[in-house]
Amino acid sequence: MVFSSNVFLFLFLPVFLGLYYLSGERYRNLLLLIASYVFYAWWRVDFLLLFAGVTVFNYWIGLRIGAAGVRTRAAQRWLILGVVVDLCVLGYFKYANFGVDSLNEIITSFGMQPFVLTHILLPIGISFYTFESISYIIDVYRGDTPATHNLIDFAAFVAIFPHLIAGPVLRFKDLVDQFNHRTHTVDKFAEGCTRFMQGFVKKVFIADTLAALADHCFALQNPTTGDAWLGALAYTAQLYFDFSGYSDMAIGLGLMMGFRFMENFNQPYISQSITEFWRRWHISLSTWLRDYLYISLGGNRGSTFQTYRNLFLTMLLGGLWHGANFTYIIWGAWHGMWLAIERALGVNAAPRVLNPLKWVITFLLVVIGWVIFRAENLQVAWRMYEAMFSFGTWQLSELNRANLTGLQVGTLVLAYLVLAFFGLRQFYNQPLQTKAPKAAANSDEVAADGPASAQPRAPREAAGDPAAIAYSPSGALVYQPSWLSQLPVLATRLALLLLFAASVLKLSAQSYSPFLYFQF
C-alpha cells in the first residue's frame, strides 16, 4: 500500500483516524502499531515476520546494552552483536543477489561455473527500519537515550506507517517523549492535512507526469543531445517532487497523529556547493550518515587524508544504501569525490560575487549525478552521458517528439517555475518586519514606554475590532479588517484544495504511478 492510492485515501486512512481518535490515549500506540503492521502486510504478509523479528531483536539488544552501562566493554560487545546481525539481515536480503551476480561475471570470464542462488525478494522498507534500529542501539550505547522497556512503543516507532516506506529516517531519541505523550489539537491536525495535500499534489500532479517523460528519454536507444538533457532535467525534477512529496505526506500524517517529524528537504536545488546540497537533500539520511558512519570512521579528527577518506567512504556507502547496483555506488563516489574536493579548495569561503557561478556548477553536478542514479545499468548511463556531452543536435529525436505531450512539457516548465519561485523566495527572504518603519516610529501613534512596546497603538474606535495592522510604503498606518489580511492565505488554501482534488481525479484516471523506493 502506498499513500498515493485510492485504497489508502478512501479506506485505510479514514478508518485508522476514526479509530485512533475514538480510542483512549493509552491505547493509541498499540493501535498505531497494529495499523502499521496491516499497512506493511498489505504488500507481503510473510515479510511481516522478518520485520517483527528485527524489531524484537533490537529491543532486546537495547535492554542488554542498557543493563551493561553506557560505553562499557560489555555494552560494546552487545552493540557489535546488534549491528552485525542488523547488517547481515540487510546484506542478505538487499545485496546477496547483487554480490553473487557480480561474482559470477568475474568467474565465468575465466571459464568457471557460476554460483546458483535463488532470487531473493527485497522486503520493502528494510533499509529504513534497519538504519533506525541501528541508530537506536548506538544511542543507547552512547547514553543519548535510555533503553526503553516498552516493547509496544519501540515497535510502533520502528513500524509507524507514515515513514515506513519512504522516510524520513527517524530516531527513537527524538520521538520517545512524543510516544509517551503528544498533544492533539485541531490546528495541528489541520496543519497535517495541509502538509499531506501538498505532498500528494507534488507526487501525483507533478512527479507522476514527469516520470513518463523521463522514462521515455532514458529508454531511447539513440538519444540526441536534446533527448538526453531533457530526460536528465525531467528526472531531476521528478525525483525531487516525488521524494519530497512522500516526505511531506509522511510529516502531514504524523501531525494528524500528534507527532512532529524532522524536515527532510529544504530547497536543495538552490545549493551553491555539494556540501550545502547534502544539508538540504534527504536531511534525515545525511545527518544519519554523519552521526553514525562518518563520525564512527573518525570524522575529521585524523589527518587531512583521513578526513577526505572518511568523506568519500561515507558517501560511497550512502550510495550503496540506495540500492544494490554499481550505478548507486558510482553515484555515491561522485558525491564523495566532490565533497572532498570542496573541502580541499575551501569552496564555502569563496567570495559572494561567485555565488551565481557556484549555483550553476552545483546544479549541473547534481543533474549529472542523477543520470547514473536513474539509469538501470552502466550501459544506459554511458549512453545518456555520451549523448549529453557529444553536443550533437539539440533537436529531439522523431521517436521522442512522437511520444511527447503538451501536458508533460507544461508540467516540466511548471516544476522548474515552482522550484525557482520557492528557491528564490528562500534565498532572498528577509525576516518579516515586526516594528514600525522609522517614519511611523516618530509619530504620536507609537507608544513611548519602552522598546518592547514600539508597536502602533490602535485608535479607540478600533478597539475590539480584530483588524490587521499594516504599513504603507510611506510608513503610515493602515488598518484593514482581519478577513482582508487573510485573503492570500485563504486563496492559497483554496488553490491547494482544488489541486488536491484534481490530483485525486488524476490518480483515479491514470494507470501509471511509479513507486521509486522499492529498492530501499
Swiss-Prot record:
InterPro entries listed in its UniProt record: Ac/AlaTfrase_AlgI/DltB, AlgI, MB_O-acyltransferase, MBOAT_fam
Sequence intervals crossing the membrane: 7-24, 39-61, 78-100, 115-137, 150-172, 239-261, 311-333, 353-375, 402-424, 483-505
Membrane topology according to the record: Multi-pass membrane protein
GO molecular function: acyltransferase activity
One Pfam family it belongs to: MBOAT
GO cellular component: plasma membrane
Keywords assigned: Acyltransferase, Alginate biosynthesis, Cell inner membrane, Cell membrane, Membrane, Transferase, Transmembrane, Transmembrane helix
Enzyme Commission number(s) from the entry: 2.3.1.-
Places the protein is found: Cell inner membrane
GO biological process, one term: alginic acid acetylation
Pathway annotation: Glycan biosynthesis; alginate biosynthesis
Active site (UniProt): H322
Origin: domain of life: Bacteria
Main location: membrane
Function noted in UniProt: Together with AlgJ and AlgF, forms an inner membrane complex which probably interacts with the alginate polymerization-transport complex and adds acetyl groups at the O-2 and O-3 positions of mannuronate residues. Acetylation of alginate is important for the architecture of biofilms and increases resistance to opsonic killing in the host.
Family stated for the protein in its record: Belongs to the membrane-bound acyltransferase family.
Protein's name in the database: Probable alginate O-acetylase AlgI
Name of the gene encoding the protein in the UniProt record: algI
